[in-house]
């Protein structure tokens, strides 16, 4: 296969992603003699397209999968998509809204058909994007969380949990999104501080009696003045919920009110009598020290109500309007319209004492931004703290208890380890899980009701009828309309994708999976729940390790979101996109269209020329370079450019190797070298003669292989990327290729063969090492390099994917060669620095004289001569007993002295040095003046101060050298 002159990723990627899949390389094996590696894809929501976070997450997962596949493991990466109940229903409802249609106009059955249509369209977009990213999951195992096999498992799990007493139905206070018309979990509620008001309202004593209320105190805190009152003052941020008040609570230690505990108040606007109660929940220092208690509309009040056996009066409908339990004057009003009217009515009756601005935490739905209402509704719950019955895997222990134990024992390991604290904290404070949602899209709850409301939980309607008949009921049954929380089915993925409840070969081979790669934002949503469900139903943990990575943010650290207009589509980084198309993409379909102008302005400023096409490999290398443990990632597009240059460097290096090796004897015989046949530095004559440089690059390769193996073991893809970059760019391309040129041009035939063999073998190994991170370019290059490097290609086609992953061979470490090369590098750098100091043109070749301390060193310096001549652009290199007297600068490397033999115009050089010394003096004075300014040091960013200090250090070092040269002149 001929290698193109330049690296053009598009055609290469299109060919290989089709070819790999066609050849069946992604399909998992279940060979009993092999170790297994399995990994679950966090199923992306079927609602749309992949974002940069997916690109990051999938780069890591694919890297691990390719690495273990090359190491000979049975490798199963299981892909799938999530039905994403709320999110998907919102998307489809918005589409209908554009046609002036509601889901209720269509009816449940027709609406669900529409959602399935959307799923088919969107799901294929997502899998197409995954393929573009070069991912290699076993597509034959692809699932959808609402496909038939998964739905059967969901039903089976639900029924079993009900039979075990671990799922129950009850009327409880839940987070209610009045726009969606469904319960949502705590994790789907975002609370942020907002500007609001505090209203102080007078609640009159029902019997009309009065009491003395202190209004002034001395320094010791004793009351000095009182006023006569026949009311108490309640402070609230939600006056509309007072219509559902059932008590007013005070601090048991608050002497202002203790004598009133037990008395009745008249609830304003409602003419109901409610008691004054004492409860530790109240803080006497906050507000007026009196708190209205509305158990049906506040979680804290609900707890107080439970302690005091209070009624629960719900005054809101499910769409947040005032209901029939409130006075007729407010019924049917929106909650905020009612608030306004209630405040006006209180004021008119002289019961509104004070209104003041107040900052408060407002809970909003993360999907709709609607203010969440605590609402008393009938819901289904999983009992998180109830002991499991006999016959389960962990009888006598709750599912939460088992989930905590599995992390504590190390059966499930979280990386970084600090995430275990977050996991434990959440589980130790867990509430029963509300799993029902008042939606149409999702797994419909497998429960049927008879005409009297009695419920029969069953795997299907026929089974429900059998259960009803057993209890003497033969009438019609109505199925529960609610669906399950999306996270319920997602929590079952570790075993629902492996054939459970059957013990299939997949189940035995791939559970627990080896690692879960996930962002910290779904530790609670998904990770903990998978541990609970998998241990409860299989007795096994779902995964051995959880690799928790940071979240991708924009370059300034802002969270990426559609509303901020700062999202990036990974495909746009691969293919490139014009600024016009990028603006259009970011401004279409905004929740708030008014944001379009500011988003367009910011986008044009940041990407005036759009985004260049970087290709998949450059994007993947960028992602890998960011993948340290745990921290958030400020994504900088310039890194993609740097890693595209890296891919170009690797491509061009391969072209150089091919040009020097194709059609040549590259040192490969059918049989391995006979004893003494493979020489080192000519010490044994024969077919190949390996130089110190050859052995150095092979030795460095072993160290790189060790570092990369550790990177994979520790999930430190940033270290893997760094090791690859440093070895390929710095060592192989910048140093070894340059040395190899010299050896091919000036060496004996045996040395040339050894050089070509080393060039090819190291390059072929590099390609296998880098393949898990940059699969496309490595495959394309390997196809041309491998046959030359002695690899026998399979007649039906071969692939780097199926080759063994390189492993370090300690026997090939060579510290002597490494020492030799380190000295050559120092010598080369010294020569280059001398050229710089003397301001010699890069085109000018000058002689080098080296002074050796003894005969042995003279021979060593002589071995460097041909390399130095090429690397430092010298006309000749001479080794002498002593350097000649000359005003030219001298560099010392170890015991050797180096001088460039150049005629110097002493007068002109003194004048040049004088000017340069004066300039540097001025720069140092200016910089020191800045650093001596306290305001500058205090106010400037630490990075700027450090840069200024570094400038002073560099200028000072250069100045010292120039002064030494000046003295010599």
UniProtKB/Swiss-Prot annotation:
Its EC number is 6.1.1.9. GO terms for cellular component: cytosol. It catalyses: tRNA(Val) + L-valine + ATP = L-valyl-tRNA(Val) + AMP + diphosphate. Residues 812-839, 904-969 form a coiled coil. The keyword Transmembrane helix does not apply. SUPFAM superfamilies: Anticodon-binding domain of a subclass of class I aminoacyl-tRNA synthetases, Nucleotidylyl transferase, tRNA-binding arm, ValRS/IleRS/LeuRS editing domain. The keyword Iron-sulfur does not apply. NCBIfam families: PRK05729.1, valS. This is Valine--tRNA ligase. It comes from Herminiimonas arsenicoxydans. The lineage of its organism: Bacteria, Pseudomonadati, Pseudomonadota, Betaproteobacteria, Burkholderiales. The gene is valS.
């Amino acid at each position: 296969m001929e290698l193109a002159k330049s690296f053009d990723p598009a055609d290469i990627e299109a060919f290989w992603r089709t070819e790999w899949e066609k050849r069946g390389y992604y399909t998992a094996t279940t060979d009993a003699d092999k170790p297994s590696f399995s990994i679950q894809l966090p199923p992306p929501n079927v609602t749309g397209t992949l974002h940069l976070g997916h690109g990051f997450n999938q780069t890591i997962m694919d890297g691990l999968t390719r690495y273990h596949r090359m190491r000979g493991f049975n490798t199963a990466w299981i892909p799938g998509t999530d039905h994403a109940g709320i999110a998907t229903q919102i998307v489809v409802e918005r589409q209908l809204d554009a046609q002036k249609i509601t889901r209720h106009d269509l009816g449940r059955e027709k609406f669900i058909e529409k959602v399935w249509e959307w799923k088919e369209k969107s799901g294929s977009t997502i899998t197409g994007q995954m393929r573009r990213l070069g991912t290699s999951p076993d597509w034959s195992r692809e699932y959808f969380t609402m496909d038939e096999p998964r739905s059967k498992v969901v039903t089976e799990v639900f029924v079993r949990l009900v039979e075990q007493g671990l799922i129950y139905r009850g009327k409880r206070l839940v987070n209610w999104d009045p726009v969606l018309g469904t319960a949502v979990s705590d994790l789907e509620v975002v609370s942020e501080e907002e500007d609001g008001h505090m209203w102080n309202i007078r609640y009159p004593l029902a019997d009309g009696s009065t009491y003395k209320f202190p209004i002034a105190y001395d320094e010791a805190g004793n009351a000095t003045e009182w006023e006569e009152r026949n009311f108490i003052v309640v402070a609230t941020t939600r006056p509309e919920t007072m219509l559902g008040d059932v008590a007013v609570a005070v601090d048991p230690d608050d002497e202002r009110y203790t004598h009133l505990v037990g008395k009745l108040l008249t609830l304003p606007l409602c003419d109901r009598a409610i008691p004054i109660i004492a409860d530790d929940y109240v803080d006497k220092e906050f507000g007026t020290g009196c708190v209205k208690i509305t158990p049906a509309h506040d979680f804290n009040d609900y707890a107080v109500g439970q302690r005091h056996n209070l009624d629960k009066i719900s005054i809101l409908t499910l769409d947040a309007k005032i209901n029939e339990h409130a006075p007729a004057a407010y019924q049917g009003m929106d909650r905020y319209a009612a608030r306004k009217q209630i405040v006006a009515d209180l004021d008119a009756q002289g019961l509104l004492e004070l209104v003041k601005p107040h900052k408060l935490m407002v809970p909003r739905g993360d999907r709709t931004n609607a203010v969440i209402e605590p609402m008393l509704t009938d819901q289904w719950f999983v009992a998180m703290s109830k002991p499991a019955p006999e016959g389960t895997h962990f009888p006598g222990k709750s599912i939460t208890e088992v989930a905590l134990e599995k992390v504590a024992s190390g059966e499930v390991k979280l990386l970084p380890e600090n995430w275990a604290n977050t996991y434990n904290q959440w589980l130790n404070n867990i509430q029963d899980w509300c799993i029902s949602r008042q939606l149409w899209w999702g797994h419909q709850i497998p429960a049927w009701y008879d005409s009297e409301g009695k419920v029969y939980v069953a795997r299907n309607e026929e089974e429900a009828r059998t259960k009803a008949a057993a209890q003497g009921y033969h009438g019609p049954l109505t199925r529960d309309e609610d669906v399950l929380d999306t996270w319920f089915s997602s929590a079952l993925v570790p075993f629902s994708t492996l054939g459970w409840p059957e013990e299939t070969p997949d189940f035995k081979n791939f559970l627990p999976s080896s690692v879960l790669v996930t962002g910290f934002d779904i530790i609670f949503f998904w990770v903990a729940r998978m541990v609970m469900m998998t241990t409860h139903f299989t007795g096994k943990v779902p995964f051995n390790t959880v690799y928790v990575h940071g979240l991708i943010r924009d370059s300034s650290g802002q969270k990426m979101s559609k509303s901020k207009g700062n999202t990036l589509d990974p495909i746009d980084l691969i293919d490139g996109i014009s600024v016009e198309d990028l603006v259009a993409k970011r401004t279409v379909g905004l929740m708030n269209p008014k944001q379009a102008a500011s988003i367009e302005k910011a986008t044009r400023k940041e990407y005036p020329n759009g985004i260049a096409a970087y290709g998949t490999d450059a994007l993947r290398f960028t992602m890998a370079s960011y993948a340290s443990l745990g921290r958030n990632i400020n994504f900088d597009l310039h890194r993609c450019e740097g890693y595209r240059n890296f891919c170009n460097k690797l491509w061009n290096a391969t072209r150089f190797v091919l040009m020097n090796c194709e059609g040549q004897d590259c040192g490969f015989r059918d049989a391995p070298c006979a004893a003494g046949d493979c020489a080192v530095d000519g010490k044994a004559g024969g077919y190949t003669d390996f130089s110190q440089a050859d052995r150095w690059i092979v030795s460095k390769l072993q160290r790189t292989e060790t570092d990369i193996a550790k990177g994979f073991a520790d999930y430190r893809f940033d270290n893997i990327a760094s090791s690859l970059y440093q070895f390929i760019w710095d060592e192989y391309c910048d140093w070894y290729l340059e040395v190899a040129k010299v050896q091919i041009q000036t060496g004996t035939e045996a040395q040339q063969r050894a050089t070509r063999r080393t060039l090819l073998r190291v390059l072929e190994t590099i390609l296998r090492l880098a393949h898990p991170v940059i699969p496309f370019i490595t495959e394309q290059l390997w196809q041309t390099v491998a046959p030359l490097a002695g690899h026998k290609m399979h007649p039906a086609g071969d692939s780097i994917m199926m080759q063994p992953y390189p492993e370090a061979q300690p026997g090939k470490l060579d510290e002597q060669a490494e020492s030799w090369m380190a000295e050559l590098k120092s010598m080369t750098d010294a020569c280059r620095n001398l050229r710089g100091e003397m301001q010699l043109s890069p085109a000018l070749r000058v002689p080098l004289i080296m002074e050796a301390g003894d005969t042995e060193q003279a021979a060593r310096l002589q071995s460097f001569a041909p390399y130095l001549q090429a690397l430092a652009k010298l006309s000749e290199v001479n080794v002498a007993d002593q350097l000649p007297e000359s005003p030219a600068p001298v560099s010392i490397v170890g015991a050797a002295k180096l001088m460039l033999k150049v005629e110097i115009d002493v007068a002109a050089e003194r004048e040049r040095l004088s000017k340069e010394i004066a300039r540097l003096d001025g720069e140092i004075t200016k910089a020191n003046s800045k650093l001596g300014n306290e305001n500058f040091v205090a106010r400037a960013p630490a990075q700027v101060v450090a840069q200024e200090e570094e400038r002073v250090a560099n200028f000072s070092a250069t100045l010292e050298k120039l002064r030494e040269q000046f003295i010599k002149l």
